[in-house]
Amino acid sequence: MLGGKQIVLTRMRTGQSGTVVQIQGGHGLVNRLSALGVRPGKRITKVSSMLMRGPVTIQVDRAQVAIGFGMANRVVVELD
């Protein structure tokens, strides 16, 4: 990557974009997120998030995907 700032998905602001660099979890989590299109190298945009550790909605390719806070907290993103 180009050395941009890396943060977890839950800390991104709404509208921010970046590239997934790592998923911090076991094979089950990696496979579940991969099935949703979230994998290292993919560019994502945070669309929204709910208060109190609610789901996080992201744009991946042309689809919007909602994932739980715990899952989103394990996705490391390099900001654009």
Model-derived segments and their meaning:
Residues 1-80:
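Compact, glycine-rich, soluble single-domain proteins
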